[in-house]
């Protein structure tokens, strides 16, 4: 178990695996960037993929489409709440580390 020294939070193996999966998906998105796809387009595709995957995950355990449809608003509320919190946390982190992250992004672009 490691520690996030910035927030003084213990990082469990499960959390490490969570962040590694997220980083892998971000790497796939970054590899889509190029002359035919800018960050806004890739971001839109990533959001669509997340929505599509989430709909599939949310359907697990339902036997009838009608029952699934009845839960639509609760499912949306759950995912919107999760996304809002994750986006808020990441915007705060990015603002607090803006100069560092901009330098990392610049270094990545220079390496290409």
Where in this protein do the model-derived segments appear?
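Solvent-exposed interaction surfaces and binding hotspots enriched for charged
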Residues: 2-112
């Amino acid at each position: 178990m490691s520690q996030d020294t910035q927030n003084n939070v213990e990082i469990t193996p499960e959390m490490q695996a969570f962040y590694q999966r997220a980083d892998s998906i971000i790497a796939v998105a970054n590899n889509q960037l190029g002359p035919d796809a800018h960050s806004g387009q890739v971001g839109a595709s990533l959001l669509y993929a997340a929505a599509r995957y989430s709909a599939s995950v949310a359907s697990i355990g339902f036997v009838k489409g009608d029952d699934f449809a009845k839960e639509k608003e609760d499912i949306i509320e759950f995912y919107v709440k999760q996304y809002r919190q994750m986006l808020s946390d990441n915007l705060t982190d990015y603002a607090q580390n803006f100069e560092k992250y901009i330098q990392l992004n610049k270094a990545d672009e220079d390496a290409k």
